[in-house]
Amino acid sequence: MDVHPPRQPIHTVKDFLLHLLTITVGLFIALSLEAAVESLHHRHLVRDARQNLHREIAANYQQYAMNAKWVAENRDQLARNIELLRELRHGKKLDPANLGWHWQWNSFSGVAWRAARDNGAVSYMAPDLIASYSWIYLQQDYINSTALAIVGEESKAGAALEAAADPSNLSPLEIQTLLVKSAEINLSLSTLQSTMKGLEDMYIEQSQNRAAETP
């Protein structure tokens, strides 16, 4: 922003005041335009970030339904494992194919939220909006890490059966260890389901708020 000297010499106080007024008005207009352009840029930044966040949250909500289905199916399998292991403990022969310790999990995405923080869009959002997005993504991250930890534990749980090749080759101690581990994993999944229900409520609230904003 440049301020140029007067083209004509200033001879009177009136000329000086007029020139000062011209400079002041010019600076005010320039600063106002600059602020308006910057404000418009910030609004566009927030608008684009929110659109990306809503798309990502909607996609995560769809993935949530699949993850919830897999967790429920895995708990059913664990319940069967526990019953079969109890029968095995009492000497009943089992088909190895009926026992299993494995399940699927697809982590929720947080790319749009990280991008909004990195490009500064979050800093121009309203505080309640920031809090809403923050809680969703914090909950997602916690659930992702918890689920992946359970996946790791469950993957190791069936190692004894894998080594034995046949359930009848398992020792009483190995059977008891498998029983306890299966029960522990099932309890962990029960807690995970409760936490996931809280995330689902957040997704629903976010969707309702978005619908209310749409004209």
Please provide the spans of the model-predicted regions.
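Long, hydrophobic alpha-helical segments that serve as membrane-spanning/inserting helices
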Residues: 1-14, 35-215
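Residues within alpha-helical transmembrane segments of multi-pass membrane proteins, especially transporters
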Residues: 21-28, 32, 36
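N-terminal signal-anchor/signal peptide hydrophobic helix marking the start
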Residues: 10-25
